[in-house]
């Protein structure tokens, strides 16, 4: 597991032009959802309709249910905190997109499970919030994502 994660991080470093987050961001304690811990914040003004994030198969780590069950409990807890489910598989974003927190009141929306679009202008310094129910392709995925 550690070797695979190290490999994925090295791919991200080599492929910065293909990074999933398409905007400048920084991490800070969540102001909107303090119990969530760390949140993802805009480090630039974002215009309505601007792409915030796009999926990159090379930079995401995908676990089948069978592979996920092979992890020890501490690994499962880590990945449950930072993964989302799509088509019954666990997807782990290796960039800071994994720090997007959940709320019903969001400032961006997921489009066809491939990219996230700003729903409105987002000023620099605002926390970027998404609805975990939009992540996934099935009702089971949605329920799992919301329970994480």
Regions found by a protein language model. Name each.
Residues 2-148:
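Conserved catalytic SET/PR domain of SAM-dependent protein methyltransferases, capturing the structural core
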